[in-house]
């Protein structure tokens, strides 16, 4: 059952949510990597190098969540130095409703799945 990846058994009532978050999130992650790279390119980094840096950062961050079992918010807080560049970027993302936009996208996917 796991020849193509990890199998997780869930109740049928969670199928739409699982489909939305597991099935659609790769596209959102690709968009995030692309946006990170676009920002780096705007700052002068070559695109290929930006993709390499940003894809590695996303992969490493995801691996930390899986390996440590720590809450993603705790991990975020660990890399935000007081008054530093990362917390400034987090502030800007929050001003732009980053989390709300992601949550709304998942909700839209769930509603679409229910309609199919």
Name each model-derived stretch.
Residues 25:
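Aromatic-residue-lined binding/catalytic grooves and analogous aromatic/hydrophobic interfacial grooves
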Residues 55-116:
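NAD(P)-dependent Rossmann-like dehydrogenase/reductase catalytic/cofactor-binding core
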Residues 21:
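Alpha-helical membrane segments and immediately flanking helix-loop junctions
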Residues 1-18, 30-67, 112, 116:
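Internal alpha-helical scaffold of NAD(P)-dependent oxidoreductase catalytic cores
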């Amino acid at each position: 059952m796991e020849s193509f990846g990890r199998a997780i058994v869930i109740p049928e009532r969670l199928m739409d949510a699982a489909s939305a978050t597991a099935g659609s999130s790769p596209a959102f992650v690709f968009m995030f990597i692309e946006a990170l790279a676009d920002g780096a390119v705007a700052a002068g980094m070559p695109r290929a190098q930006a993709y390499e840096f940003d894809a590695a950062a996303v992969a490493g961050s995801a691996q930390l969540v899986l390996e440590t079992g720590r809450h993603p918010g705790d991990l975020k807080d660990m890399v935000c130095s007081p008054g530093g560049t990362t917390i400034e970027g987090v502030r800007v993302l929050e001003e732009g409703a980053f989390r709300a936009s992601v949550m709304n996208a998942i909700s839209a996917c769930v509603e679409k799945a229910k309609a199919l």
